[in-house]
Amino acid sequence: LKARPVLAILVVQAILFLGHWFVYSTFIAFWPGLTPAAVADLRVAMIVLALSFVIASLLSFRFSNPVVSVIYWAAAVWLGFVNFFLSGSVVIRLAWLAIRFSHLVANPHAFRGPLAEVIYSIAVLAGIYGLVNARIIRIRRVPVQIPNLPASWRGRRAVMMSDLHLGPINGVQFCRRVVAAASQLKPDVVFIPGDLFDGTKGDLDHLVAPLRELSPRLGIYFSTGNHEEFTSPKQYIDAIARVGIRVLANEQVVVDGLRIAGVMYHDSSSPLRMKAALDKMRSASSESGVAQPDILLNHAPTRLPIVEHAGFSLQLSGHTHGGQIFPFTWITRRVYGRFTRGLHRFGSLEVYTSTGAGTWGPPMRVGMQPEIVLLEFE
């Protein structure tokens, strides 16, 4: 492993240890009737669980088999639950301080046990709800008006499905469900702006095989996300191309008068590389004597001033998952602002950010719904 990935792993593991320690210390302080033996067992369990997701992730990058898939799923589910236990622990500590120092209760210590029981029970219910909610994919219809839209595109329908994260958790059956839902919408074209794969080891051809059943008459177009570029993107790009999907790796195509472009995530993550990639496409458009590109597949809703300056009318993005679960729904909003999800304007550029169909990490959605987007060109 190179130095930067190792450092990132160590930082993530340190955060997980800190979070588990806070949950553990709060639980033993507030949960009634714990024996010394139970506390010791809990301490060992929390150490193992704190290590579980990083270990499972490393295994999933090297091996692909049912045992690793089960380990990864269990670790990811626990990651979701401990997230809610951590939030619950913060609430318990704050509520206890309020009860203790408000002097409104004669015996505040009597509330310690019931307080923990109620809050941790809510955390468990939130996790269960998240598991169920993540499997219910909504169809979101979005009317789109593009000033330079060719007349031939008016009234056409495009399906946008991002962030499927095909891998140990979202397998081939999940892909079939997404394809079936998309097919029912009878799209003229399909856009996939990244993270079709989770980036883990697996039978890539098998995972994307259901996509062969999608047959929009104007094609399917894909640009890479960060999960296709964790290692070498070539294996993922090749698997996607083999099912008949056009991969736009800093490339553009003209489809019935509409120019569609895609930028690789690595290049979009740098302003200089992003500008160079779009300038190259703009130069090719000028040399051919045709109009500027109209639609850009850009995995993350970033570099908007550069995209607008390059003359695009519509950017299609994913990446954010809308935050996926609380409190990351709030954190993501702080990072991406209004472009966290939905359709918004940046100057002359329209930007649609999808919350995605799949999940990463915890297979849960709380405070945010998974979606397939139907774009209706007006």
Predicted regions mapped to residue ranges:
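Soluble catalytic domains of enzymes that build or remodel membrane lipids, polysaccharides, and related
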Residues: 145-378
